Amino acid sequence: MARIAGVNIPTAKRVVIALTYIHGIGPKFAQEIMDKVGIPAEKRVHQLTDAEVLQIREAIDRDYQVEGDLRRETSMNIKRLMDLGCYRGLRHRRGLPVRGQRTHTNARTRKGPAKAIAGKKK
């Protein structure tokens, strides 16, 4: 198993697919990395040489923010919104949908399981 950006990449898969196992790299960025490094798209991870793995590692470290750094930046952005007290920050703080979705019905994923209200009847 190759290890890139702290993630074990599955050896049997094509490199383009295997790179998407890294948080912050989707299909588009994976293909972009392959084009930069010059590795054919149909090549599988177990066929990569150590030099090619090193090239991929360096390309990711140089050009992309992935894994822990990306997660940290995302959480810091959310924390900043919450500290500002803006509308989006309040929605994050209250655990409600942030992007304008309705909450009268639905939004159960964000709000959690339904809570029974004592004394309320239909």
Curated annotation (Swiss-Prot):
The keyword Translocase does not apply. It holds the Pfam family Ribosomal_S13. GO terms for biological process: translation. GO terms for molecular function: rRNA binding; structural constituent of ribosome; tRNA binding. Transmembrane segments: none annotated. InterPro entries: Rbsml_uS13_C, Ribosomal_uS13, Ribosomal_uS13-like_H2TH, Ribosomal_uS13_bac-type, Ribosomal_uS13_CS. Keywords: Ribonucleoprotein, Ribosomal protein, RNA-binding, rRNA-binding, tRNA-binding. Gene3D superfamilies: 1.10.8.50, 30s ribosomal protein s13, domain 2 (4.10.910.10). It comes from the Bacteria. Belongs to the universal ribosomal protein uS13 family. Part of the 30S ribosomal subunit. Forms a loose heterodimer with protein S19. Forms two bridges to the 50S subunit in the 70S ribosome. Located at the top of the head of the 30S subunit, it contacts several helices of the 16S rRNA. In the 70S ribosome it contacts the 23S rRNA (bridge B1a) and protein L5 of the 50S subunit (bridge B1b), connecting the 2 subunits; these bridges are implicated in subunit movement. Contacts the tRNAs in the A and P-sites. This is Small ribosomal subunit protein uS13. It comes from Agrobacterium fabrum (strain C58 / ATCC 33970) (Agrobacterium tumefaciens (strain C58)).
